């Protein structure tokens, strides 16, 4: 072998070993990123980058993963290297901007016109204006907001932040003039925008207008934060302006308002980057915290959401909202008992809130603790009576719990009460109609209720199954067949629907097809669920001796075709 050939072999082996050394962490990182597991993705991308430091794709991915976890300090060195390599990266610019703000290097941001693509016109414009505020150039900053307002689609954001900038330096009159103008758009109609304006009006001793604004915007709806604000206004206590009390708060508000807007426009994996910057710049920004937790939930990262929700202090007015979110995330992550414990503790501290009692009822109902659920629902209904009355769903959920524990009289009354609140609600119409069919009560009314439900929700397998089953119970077997077949098309692996179709087939003489459907139902049934409507022992008995014989054994009425 020549020297050149030997060098080529050694070089090939080195390249192969290098490729193998990076492949493991890279593939693991890609897999984690696809599942939105940013914690693992950040770890593996960092490992891969350590083995291939100049790889700009790895740099970008590592920056994204670290930022998604809110780790600006870890993302910043990688972002610096990425930009230094000549690579244009919006996310790297986002990280470096956040790092400058954290370092209070406002001069670097004042009126900044980004080289390359920057972060984007909206963020770059707002950051530049707030940077000017940070170095004391208030007039130039206000002009910067005005210039940004001239760009299509950015007027509302620019004016909102101009109002916040004015209020942050005590010019509440100027801030209110902006809010009172017609051009501010939807940005100031958000809950956060409304509450900021309420604080400004209070600083101007215009408490009556502040109260009227709350009533107009929230239509009397209340929560602990609004209750505290209303009480202070009624007592003539001036509300401090807390929404943007400093330049740092202003920067945080930039990224929060962009994240809130992106929520309905972009994917959660992108939106969370802006929400995390807002949190990093202002750790006490509870709205940003709640948004971040909700985005983690949307991404299926329930454990991360649980951690973030836990960050809301127990004395904050939004604590109950955070605990409701934390319990929901626990339930979705397979920890139902822990979720119930959180809600039970919350009911001890915030039991005066109908939403807390209702959530506790829901969690208990989902664990088949129907008697306990009814107790919680009763409290929720009583509390709701004092604030406009209970929702149809609250009455419906309580009725289900009563029905499942055998209290049919209360259940029927509850379903009918829910229909008074929402007369055409298909879920309620279906549940009431189906329950009447199962009890062989008021069958004509039951059929009418279910037909209304089908008209309102024609693609619901459960509701179409109810219609077919009602027709079967009425002895209208031939009419039941197409509806039951359609229900099975929509819910192919549901044991109850397959069992029902088997019974209908048997009733019209299609016995072999009936046995096939019963066998399918048996393959899908959960043997460990005693509350399941599909009873495996009964299905097996039908397969052994047929439906007619089973009905005879049970002392039930035989199959009989309805007479016209």
Positions of predicted regions on the chain:
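TPR-adjacent "capping" and linker segments in tetratricopeptide-repeat scaffold/adaptor proteins
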Residues: 17-24, 113-120, 239-254, 385-392
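TPR alpha-solenoid repeat register
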Residues: 58, 92, 124, 158, ...
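Structural marker of alpha-solenoid helical repeat scaffolds
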Residues: 51, 84-86, 116-119, 150-152, ...
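Canonical tetratricopeptide repeat
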Residues: 61-62, 95-96, 127, 161, ...
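Register position in tetratricopeptide repeats
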Residues: 34, 68, 102-103, 134-135, ...
